[in-house]
Amino acid sequence: MSGLTLGGGGSGGVRPTQPAAFASLQDSADADRRSSTTTSNNPPPLPSDFSQLSDDFSFGSPISPPHSSNAPDSLLHDSLFPEWKVGTPRAGFDGPDEMQRKDPLATQIWKLYSRTKAQLPNQERMENLTWRMMAMSLKRKERERAQQSRSASARNSVSGPSGIAQLTSPPLIASRPTRQNPSLSTDLTSDPMNLERIFIVPFESPSDHPSPQLTKGEATSAAIPIKSRKDQVAESTPVPASFPHPPQDQRKNSEFGYVPRRVRKTSIDDRQFFNLQVPTRKRPAEASPQVPPVSNAMLAQDPDLSGGVPDYALDASSAFALHHNNHSSSHHNHTSPGMPFGLDTYGLGEDPILTSAGPYQTQFTFSPTESPMTSGNPFANLYAHTPVASSLNSTDFFSPPQSGYQSTASTPQPAYDGEHSMFFDMPSVDARTQRRVPNYVSHRTSNLSASLQPRYMFNQNQDQSHHTGNHSSSMHSPGYPIPQPQHVDPTQVLNPNDFSTGASHAAMFSFGADSDNEDDDGNQFSDRAGLTMPGDLDDGADMNGGMQWDAQFPGSFHSLPGFTAQHRKHVTIGPTDMMDTPSEWAQSGSLGRTHGSAASVSEVRNREQDPRRQKIARTTSTPNTAQLLRQSMNANTSHTSPNTPPESGLSSAVPSRPASPGGSKNGEQSSGPTTCTNCFTQTTPLWRRNPEGQPLCNACGLFLKLHGVVRPLSLKTDVIKKRNRSSANSLAVGTSRASKKSARKNSVQQTTVTTPTSSRAQSGATSFGVRRPRAGAVRRAEPLVPIAAAPPKANPTTSSPGQSRGTSSVQMAPKRQRRLEKATDAEAGGDEASKSSTASGGRSKVVALAPAMPPAAANPANHSIAGGQGASQEWEWLTMSL
């Protein structure tokens, strides 16, 4: 076929064409049309009749009229469509790459058209045809995809329950037929939206609602089967899928055991726990303990329920942890009496990574014993348990045991060198061999109803002399009223010289994040042994005298075995607060809620008797419950001064030691932590000293330095010095300020300034309120600007002795005075001081700062500014705030 005929078959010349181009176009066009009715990928044969395309390519179109056969091509030349000659596609069309993703067949046609459109007649109509063919091809494929998706969803709607429902039903449901009974099968078939089988079983009686039995014999459903675990056993009670499943040793043998089982949060939990009124929970982590809403009464009715709820424990480490002993799986399956499951602790104590700093003492009692969370209480079985119907939490609802996870830096661990932690496993040459506190009681009990009962530190008939700090005998196990028959006698199995009773426990705890061990000496072996054996008593100890002392009582200084007063810089966690009151222990009154606080870091550091290692305390501002205990057991607390303010037990500023340390000399060791002698605080970022060398906190020290007055506890603004900007108004400001003085609202004894006229000897010597500066220290020029307020004076130019008071003496008493008095007292003191200065040769005197401390009335060494210091330091104190 070498050309095309005219549209009507009339006369006219035949337009020469390119046969190869039309032949390829014919193949592509006809193939695309045939592809709309068939899905064959084979190329179709060439059609015998090509007349169906004659209308599209004839010259009978309006673009090419039939009578213009000689020169009809001028309309389609370069002047109108220059891009057809070049062969470039028009702007706005999709490129071949984009069309290749949509339809490969349409892409072939587009490539054919883009190459041959410059030589084709009727290019616009050919372009329209091409786009319509591509649109039909795309729509046809979309219809086929939609039909396939509808057929697949129709097949899945009549299949068995979904994978989510299989988790709540007995296992192996995917391989079993889906028809249980006629009613259930009709429901599944009729309702295509029924994708799950939800069994809502009341937790009160789960055995009364058995699940439907499944029968075999039908084909496997088309749903996606969920492979059940090999070790999973069919059970009658459903367990929600969101319950955590701790790592188990059996999972290592499963097919996908290396993949952690993700805890799913599905609608099953919301529906199943809606009747129980449990709020929607967050999705728990893999190892987080989940408290299932079941109780002991339910387990009595349905023993299989305990097998359905997964085991859990806070001490449960990974099953893939390295156990360096072969019997770790045997001696770690300790089943507690209060727990319904056989909890496996997975050998946490033998983990080589966590116990790098020493074996973890699971029952070491360094927490308050009256807390309900404590498990090491020896009298836990004697207490009444909280019933199930109580509004409080109790252990009848399964609570996990205490957390035994190690911390890398903040958990105090016994600093042992070896890896073995049992009692008699390996002998060691080193004196710091392994000592371990025994597990007295290894179960959790509910102490809620009995935790508020009073406890007594000592037996009321016991003598105090058995419990001094340096006594060699101490009872290392909790105080049982009778000797324990199951106790091992350490003298029969151990070397008597192996353990030292009076050993210091300074290096027993090493704080992981504390690296300031620069002051530790090398003597850390023989006298730094760890925990001694329980019951390692000497012959002087009385075992039959009842409960001598309660080892777990917070505030007892015998809570650590072999406790002595010598401590190093290591952190000691535990109830090691010394009972330093001198009264008798057998007091009738006791504290009901004795949740005592443990000793702080500063108390341990300040018990060191070496004066070279005296350090400034760093304490925590916790409520001082140990001070409350001392006040309840002490009615005759001795104070340094009768005006010393009493101690309050709930204030964070109250020291957990004596009321005030008192004046200490240079070589004297203080008996407690550093305490501010003004406000009695122990928590300050910086410690300062007054002129007498006594410690002040940062607030009191700065106040004394800036204002020249000891900081009052009830702060008044009249003691704060304001700058005198000019000399003109200084006298008026000082006068008005002197008239506003009032007595200090403080519990400290008020002491007035002793004037020089009270004693003739004091006028020429150092007195309490008047000091003589060095000669030449004060300028003798007459027009001195008064620093502080002075009484109203006459004209200062007069040279008479009675009128030269304002110029010959610089009165600094109202500014620099520690204790404020009435304005009349200040004026009288100023007049007497000026008279004394006139009688002693006109030398100016300065009424100076007298920062005596609260116990200054009983300490005569505090009556001066600097008792043994020179006048240069005195003048420095006088002028440091100018």
UniProtKB/Swiss-Prot annotation:
Signal peptide: none annotated. GO terms for biological process: negative regulation of transcription by RNA polymerase II; nitrate assimilation; positive regulation of transcription by RNA polymerase II. InterPro entries: AreA_GATA, AreA_N, Transcription_factor_GATA, Znf_GATA, Znf_NHR/GATA. Keywords: Activator, DNA-binding, Metal-binding, Nitrate assimilation, Nucleus, Transcription, Transcription regulation, Zinc, Zinc-finger. GO terms for cellular component: nucleus. Residues 604-613 have a biased composition (Basic and acidic residues). Residues 1-13 have a biased composition (Gly residues). Residues 1-75, 139-191, 228-257, 325-344, 394-422, 461-545, 579-675, 723-871 are annotated as: Disordered. A zinc finger (GATA-type) spans 676-700. Residues 48-59, 745-759, 848-861 have a biased composition (Low complexity). Residues 156-169, 177-191, 394-413, 492-503, 617-642, 795-811 have a biased composition (Polar residues). Residues 325-334 have a biased composition (Basic residues). GO terms for molecular function: DNA-binding transcription factor activity, RNA polymerase II-specific; RNA polymerase II cis-regulatory region sequence-specific DNA binding; zinc ion binding. It is found in: Nucleus. Pfam families: AreA_N, GATA, GATA_AreA. PROSITE patterns: GATA_ZN_FINGER_1, GATA_ZN_FINGER_2. Major nitrogen regulatory protein. Positively acting regulatory gene of nitrogen metabolite repression. This is Nitrogen regulatory protein areA. It comes from Aspergillus niger.
